[in-house]
């Protein structure tokens, strides 16, 4: 019954904000046009469609707000005006009663609160639709007291989420059947991704693992601080991390008055992001100003502080190659190569003509070169490429769309700090190093080192293996003996050839690296 009532509520909100008109407008049958005219009679639909959708999602509650936030990252699927409006959605939810948070913690640990924490602040410092945060003090396994932040899941969230998701899945099926744009927008796929995303957020162990991975990756980079996870105090619905203190990055004047080098801070943000992308293939994908502070402590002055690790992105070597080659081809204005990269990726239907895709990409990219290099937005370039690709039914991978959205956030943040930030100059060394690593001797050397133990063990055992085989089948396999002995001779010759040619091969690889550097432009 409750699901039925919730469904009626959703339908009423959809009707009141004119969102049904967006679906019905896809139909061209005369009777559907008449139905649309009747249904929209007397309603004010003067607001832009994106604004109406945003306001409807806000009225439907936090789960739908989160859904809108996820949709805003799918610039490959959503029209630009709708994606831009959905990006304005804010996860504003009042905190739940602190006693409920205490009960959740005690239930998770099966202990009283004073047996878990040295002290616990009952007043939450932050709240969102999924969880809220309290400050506390713990005593670690060495007896050292630590200031921590405790994230506690809202109770009953799984039940609420499952009910709304069931309705979303049902609506997605209907939209895909009834709307002419349904198959292109892939509502069932989008809702399925959102389903996975929300259930991942319900497991705080996963978020803690993301934080631990980023902290480990960033240890050698003195530009960013990632809070330490205290695993002894983590459960699926409670996460305890190091308490971080700093100034929100949006408070630029306060940072400037404190002596922070603002232009350097802008460059450092880009450096952090591209290090995570091209070196680690694992990046913080929720780097908006609310999740970033700047340290003013003497030993870590001017460093970024990253918070909230519920959303991360992972990239394969193929994804990184796609990005690096697309960016370099774009700045060379080699639009044919950009089109070829899309086709080589296998995301484009086989019937796509390269010249047509090239012409469409040229129309998108060429206007960017009328402005200074420092004003070119790599995030916008990717977004426009994805939007152009949509016309050709290109299947863009979700992780690349997530990266594009994060890149836009990084660029916006960087240029808010320093309007003269040249993103390309900062990004270029990372692209160049990655390309050289892929084409130069470093990659070959890494692969040789990876395979060396296996071959080092196999080669000395070859005579023994031959002898064992022959003694088991004495007199029966003369031809096999000849073949194995011949193979051993060939192996010895091959090893000698590798050793004798090694120096020349290394020299050739060094020359190749120099050629790659010269061809960068």
UniProtKB/Swiss-Prot annotation:
Q: Which compartments is it annotated to reside in? A: Cell inner membrane
Q: Which residues form the active site?
A: 286
InterPro entries of this UniProt entry?
ABC1_dom (IPR004147), Kinase-like_dom_sf (IPR011009), UbiB (IPR010232), UbiB_bact (IPR045308), UbiB_kinase (IPR050154)
Give TM regions.
Answer: 496-516
Domain of life here?
Bacteria
Keyword flag 4Fe-4S: no
Which family does the entry's similarity section mention?
A: Belongs to the ABC1 family. UbiB subfamily.
- What is this protein called in UniProt? Probable protein kinase UbiB
């Amino acid at each position: 019954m409750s699901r039925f009532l919730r469904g009626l509520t959703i339908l009423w909100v959809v009707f009141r904000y004119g969102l049904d008109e967006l679906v019905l407008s896809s139909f061209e049958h005369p009777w559907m046009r008449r139905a649309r005219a009747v249904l929209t009679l007397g309603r004010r639909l003067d607001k832009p469609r994106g604004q109406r959708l945003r306001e409807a999602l806000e009225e439907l509650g936090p789960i739908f707000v989160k859904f809108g936030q996820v949709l805003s990252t799918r610039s490959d699927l959503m029209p630009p005006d709708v994606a831009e409006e959905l990006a304005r959605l804010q996860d504003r939810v009042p905190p739940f009663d602190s006693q409920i948070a205490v009960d959740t913690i005690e239930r998770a640990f099966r202990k009283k609160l004073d047996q878990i924490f040295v002290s616990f602040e009952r007043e939450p410092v932050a709240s969102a639709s999924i969880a809220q945060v309290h400050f506390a003090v713990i005593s670690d396994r060495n007896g050292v007291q630590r200031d921590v932040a405790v994230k506690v899941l809202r109770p009953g969230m799984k039940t609420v989420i499952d009910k709304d998701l069931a309705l979303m899945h049902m609506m997605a099926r209907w939209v895909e059947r009834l709307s002419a744009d349904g198959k292109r927008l892939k509502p069932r796929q989008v809702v399925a991704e959102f389903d996975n995303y929300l259930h991942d957020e319900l497991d705080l162990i996963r978020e803690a693992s993301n934080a631990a991975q980023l902290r480990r990756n960033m240890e050698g980079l003195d530009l960013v601080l990632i809070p330490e996870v205290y695993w002894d105090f983590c459960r699926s619905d409670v996460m305890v991390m190091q308490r971080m203190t700093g100034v929100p990055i949006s408070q630029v004047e306060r940072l400037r008055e404190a002596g922070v080098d603002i232009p350097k801070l802008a460059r450092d943000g880009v450096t952090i992001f591209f290090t995570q992308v091209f070196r680690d293939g694992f990046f913080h994908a929720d780097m908006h100003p609310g999740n970033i502070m700047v340290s003013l402590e003497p030993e870590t002055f001017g460093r970024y502080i990253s918070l909230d690790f519920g959303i991360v992105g992972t990239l394969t070597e193929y994804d990184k190659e796609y990005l690096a080659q697309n960016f370099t081809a774009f700045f060379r204005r080699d639009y044919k190569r950009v089109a070829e990269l899309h086709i080589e990726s296998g995301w484009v239907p086989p019937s796509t003509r390269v010249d047509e895709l090239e012409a469409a990409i040229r129309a998108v990219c060429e206007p960017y070169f009328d402005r200074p290099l420092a004003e070119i937005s790599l995030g916008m370039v990717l977004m426009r490429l994805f939007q152009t690709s949509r016309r050709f039914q290109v299947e863009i991978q979700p992780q690349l769309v997530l990266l594009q959205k994060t890149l836009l956030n990084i660029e916006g943040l960087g240029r808010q700090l320093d309007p003269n930030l040249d993103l390309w100059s900062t990004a270029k060394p990372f692209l160049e190093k990655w390309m050289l690593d892929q084409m130069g001797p470093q990659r070959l050397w890494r692969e040789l080192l990876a395979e060396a133990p296996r071959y080092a063990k196999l080669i000395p055992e070859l005579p023994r293996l031959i002898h064992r085989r022959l003694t088991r089948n004495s007199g029966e396999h003369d031809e096999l003996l000849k073949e194995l002995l011949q193979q051993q001779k060939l192996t010895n010759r091959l090893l000698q050839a590798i050793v004798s040619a090694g120096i020349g091969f290394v020299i050739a690889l060094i020359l190749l690296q120099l050629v790659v550097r010269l061809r960068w432009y």
